[in-house]
Amino acid sequence: MQRSKIKVEIKRLSHGEDLSLPCYATVQSAGMDLYAALNDSAVLNPLERLLVPTGIVIAIPNGFEGQVRPRSGLAAKHGITVLNSPGTIDSDYRGEVKICLINLSNQPYEIKRGDRIAQILISPVSQVIWDDREEFCAEETGRNAGGFGSSGR
């Protein structure tokens, strides 16, 4: 199946000019890696969070959003994840893309300039029009109001 492609404007800021643009690691990758545009290395201690610059600004087209997600290897091997995962970048945002990382391990972790720290997906979004009703859908769904843990282990 052929994936659709969209053009997204991107600009490297002065502190990110030497870094790679976000890119797919493999042909079938869903997300593109984002790089740390830190001037100096930073140590992320256990349970600390850090807003890491990427050195880029992007112009996401209307009808799309950017989703910032953790890199699975960083999370599994080092406990480093994106705090507000997935982070949402709205199509009208024009500031620098920054990543809010947190260290959930019990060991300090050093983030160096150029490290791949997260991934970004550009995805279509719908805009909701609420249908406010006094009588709510009474149709049985099998789940109904069952919430957390209701579908079993």
Swiss-Prot record:
Keywords attached to this entry: Hydrolase, Magnesium, Metal-binding, Nucleotide metabolism
Record's catalysed reaction(s): dUTP + H2O = dUMP + diphosphate + H(+)
Residues that bind substrate: R71, S72, G73, N84, T88, I89, D90, K98
Any Pfam family matching the protein: dUTPase
Gene3D superfamilies found in the cross-reference section: 2.70.40.10
Record PANTHER family: DEOXYURIDINE 5'-TRIPHOSPHATE NUCLEOTIDOHYDROLASE (PTHR11241:SF0)
Family assignment from sequence similarity: Belongs to the dUTPase family.
This protein's name: Deoxyuridine 5'-triphosphate nucleotidohydrolase
Gene designation: dut
